[in-house]
Regions:
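Short flexible coil/turn linkers enriched for glycine and charged/polar residues
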Residues: 111-114, 127, 158, 204, ...
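N-terminal [4Fe-4S]-dependent radical SAM core
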Residues: 89-118, 135-136
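Short sequence/structural segments immediately N-terminal
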Residues: 87, 95, 155, 175
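Short, intrinsically disordered, charge-biased short linear motifs at domain edges
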Residues: 105-111, 117-120, 163-169, 185-189, ...
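Iron-sulfur cluster-binding cysteine motifs and their immediate structural context
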Residues: 126-151, 159-196, 201, 205-220, ...
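Iron-sulfur-associated redox domains of electron-transfer enzymes in respiratory
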Residues: 1-77, 84-87, 217-507
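Short, surface-exposed ligand-recognition loops at beta-strand->loop->(often short) alpha-helix junctions
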Residues: 122-124, 248
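Gly-rich Lys/Arg/Thr-decorated short loops/hinges at beta-loop-alpha junctions or inter-strand turns
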Residues: 108-116, 139-148, 187, 205, ...
Length: 507
């Protein structure tokens, strides 16, 4: 539903804005403010969305807690919204799992997969739906002449739907479960969505596909702002998928100026880290494939790499050991600014958990999504479109580095680095987008179907531009990133000035 301003986006934006406003007003008592906010966000005597103002406020209360980084609670727990706020009311608070949470009393308990005959059935003579059903679940209603499906016999294969000339048979699925490429969403005893965290990789696709807004993730909006207010030098590392996320007229120069107005010491483009990552992965590929490894998979998408390690542990060593663009950019910033704090601002929910890894925690202090950043801008009434342009724009990354944001871009950047130094080298590439496709790709690779290949996996269909923290329509973002990438001063990752820093950053 990215690119469509729904009621869910409206509520999420209000919550992010109010949390940011609360952080900026340090004179406000946080505990009391947390209790007041559900009434400010959902005013009046009647509900706007669910026809129950008390339920709406309760849901908003849990969303506020998650936006503060606090744990989600059940309806059975009797405690104020601000319960435990002391843990969040400080400048340095890391995310604690689980990151993605189902607010149970907001869940509609949608039915699981079901094949259904609609009123569009014409009761035709052919009835191909009956003929193709392998279980004899489709029969004819002698009164109406229409097809009916015995749900006890139906195995949800969808063959009947595929042969209906009138498209009168539909397959209904729980949206969150359908979006989950890890099959991590099931139903609890009340029919509510339940996340199996042993399977979940925190990609956030369930979050953006739930039509009831019952799934939410935790945030560090409050803590980031408090860190800036404390006087610490806080640097923004902005992922290349930012193009167009804050409006079609918001240029990189305007974004940089706006970030500085918020108090950030400076702004770096994570595409410079992507260039470094491409170079490191190219070197590792040439060194290890096929002599030491049967294939190599890219490492920049955390949901993809975590999925690979969970489902294919025997081939975990085939996931590139190269540092991700986020980590490399943060290291670069801290190398030149030793006492700095770094905020990664991007499209990805899974980056929040990547930042919790022991190997990354000292590099990346906070992670925010573009959607959360939009709330911060609104809290300070920053008019990005009319902001005076910062002539320096953002960092000088390459075309290939900026294209990391789009599916296929990572592998292309690595191949281009190899081809520059070894033009005779043949590089075989396979890529997948969406966790279902990614799982299939890795399954085939482990069976020996991709010997010597470079494999690229993107958990979100379309790449980073389709991440859970984006706001713009995916195709629009892909086009915008492509145009922005072409404006880079360098085509290839190995041509940028930052490449010389790589050896110092990965020692």
């Amino acid at each position: 539903m990215r690119g469509v301003e729904t009621r869910i986006q409206e509520i999420r934006h209000k919550i992010f804005t109010e949390v940011a406003r609360m952080a900026y007003h340090s004179e406000w008592p946080v505990k009391e403010r947390m209790e007041e906010l559900p009434y400010k966000i959902i005013p009046g005597e009647t509900g706007n969305f669910r026809n129950d103002v008390f339920l709406e406020r309760a849901i908003v209360g849990e969303r506020l807690r998650l936006a503060m980084g606090l744990p989600n609670r059940s309806a059975a727990e009797h405690a104020p919204v601000s319960d435990g706020i002391e843990a969040a009311d400080q400048a340095e608070t890391y995310y604690t799992p689980p990151l993605i949470n189902v607010i149970k009393f907001a869940c509609n308990a949608c039915p699981t997969k079901r094949v259904h005959v609609t009123d569009g059935c014409q009761g035709c003579l052919a009835h191909p739906c009956m003929e193709v059903c392998p279980k004899g679940a489709v029969s004819l209603d002698r009164t109406t002449g229409r097809s009916i499906i015995d749900q006890e016999k139906c195995i949800k294969c969808g063959r009947c739907a595929s042969v209906c000339s009138y498209n009168a048979i539909i397959i209904q699925e729980r949206p969150c479960a359908k979006a989950c490429g890890m099959d991590a969403i099931t139903s609890d005893e009340n029919g509510k969505a339940n996340i199996d965290y042993d399977k979940c990789v925190s990609c956030g696709q369930c979050l953006v596909n739930c039509p009831f807004g019952a799934i939410a993730d935790k945030s560090q909006i409050f803590q980031t702002i408090r860190a800036i207010q404390s006087g610490e030098k806080v640097y923004a590392a902005v992922a290349p998928a930012f193009v167009g996320q804050f409006g079609p007229k918001v240029t990189p120069g305007k974004l940089r100026a706006a970030m500085k107005e918020l108090g950030f010491a400076d702004v770096f483009e994570v595409a410079i880290g992507a260039d470094l990552c491409a170079k490191q992965e190219a070197e590792d590929f040439l060194k290890e494939v096929p002599d030491e490894l049967p294939f190599m998979a890219t490492s920049c998408c955390p949901a993809w790499s975590v999925m690979a390690k969970k489902l294919f542990p025997d081939h975990a060593n085939c996931i590139s050991m190269a540092l991700t663009p986020m980590t490399l950019t943060a290291r670069l910033i801290k190398k030149h600014n030793p006492n700095a704090k770094v905020v990664f601002i991007g499209p990805c929910a899974a980056k929040k958990l990547e930042a919790m890894r022991r190997s990354v925690r000292s590099e990346v202090d906070f992670v925010l999504t573009f959607e959360e950043m939009a709330g911060i801008f609104d809290a300070k009434h920053v008019d990005l479109e009319n902001m005076e342009e910062d002539p320096d724009g953002v960092s000088d990354a390459s075309t290939d580095g900026r294209n990391f944001a789009v599916a296929g871009g990572v592998a292309q950047a690595v191949v281009d680095v190899i081809k520059r130094d070894h033009p005779e080298q043949e590089i075989k590439v396979a890529n997948a987008e969406g966790l279902k496709e990614c799982r299939q790709l890795l399954k085939l690779a482990t069976l020996g179907k991709y010997p010597g290949y470079l494999l690229e996996g993107m958990a979100c269909p379309g790449g980073c531009v389709a991440g859970a923290g984006t706001m713009q329509a995916i195709k629009k973002s892909q086009t915008a990133v492509g145009l922005y990438a072409k404006k880079a001063n360098h085509q290839f990752s190995s041509e940028t000035e930052y490449i010389k820093e790589l050896d110092k950053l990965v020692d």
